[in-house]
């Protein structure tokens, strides 16, 4: 434990914030290439087959990201844009794929919350 004098001379060092999406390296989104597209099951009280993709980012980091919405066209070598945002019932999934950009098409037939799923306005 430091003495009062040592604290006066040096002070305490603040810890700093921990990033929730470290692979983005302070960028709002990052581009990447899908290395594997698969389904996985969620944690205990929930049951489903959640669609996820393993993505190698332009900075070389490989992350697991969630594919939101109903149905998708992603496969290996698809180029996608990822953003931060975890999926609470999938351990290790801390990123979301942005729908309607690059190789990922928007959700077909989506009427509500369209901007979140890259769906165009219906005519």
Swiss-Prot record:
Pfam families the record matches: Ribosom_S12_S23 (PF00164)
CDD domains named among the record's database cross-references: Ribosomal_S12
GO molecular function (one): rRNA binding
Signal sequence, start to end: none
A GO CC term assigned to this protein in UniProt: small ribosomal subunit
GO annotation (BP), single: translation
Ribosomal protein recorded as keyword: yes
Positions of modified residues (3-methylthioaspartic acid): 89
Keyword line: Methylation, Ribonucleoprotein, Ribosomal protein, RNA-binding, rRNA-binding, tRNA-binding
Disulfide bonds: none
Task of the protein: With S4 and S5 plays an important role in translational accuracy. Interacts with and stabilizes bases of the 16S rRNA that are involved in tRNA selection in the A site and with the mRNA backbone. Located at the interface of the 30S and 50S subunits, it traverses the body of the 30S subunit contacting proteins on the other side and probably holding the rRNA structure together. The combined cluster of proteins S8, S12 and S17 appears to hold together the shoulder and platform of the 30S subunit.
Similarity field: Belongs to the universal ribosomal protein uS12 family.
Subunit structure, as described in the record: Part of the 30S ribosomal subunit. Contacts proteins S8 and S17. May interact with IF1 in the 30S initiation complex.
HAMAP family, sorted: Ribosomal_uS12_B
UniProt-recorded name of the protein: Small ribosomal subunit protein uS12
Organism: Citrifermentans bemidjiense (strain ATCC BAA-1014 / DSM 16622 / JCM 12645 / Bem) (Geobacter bemidjiensis)
Gene designation per UniProt: rpsL
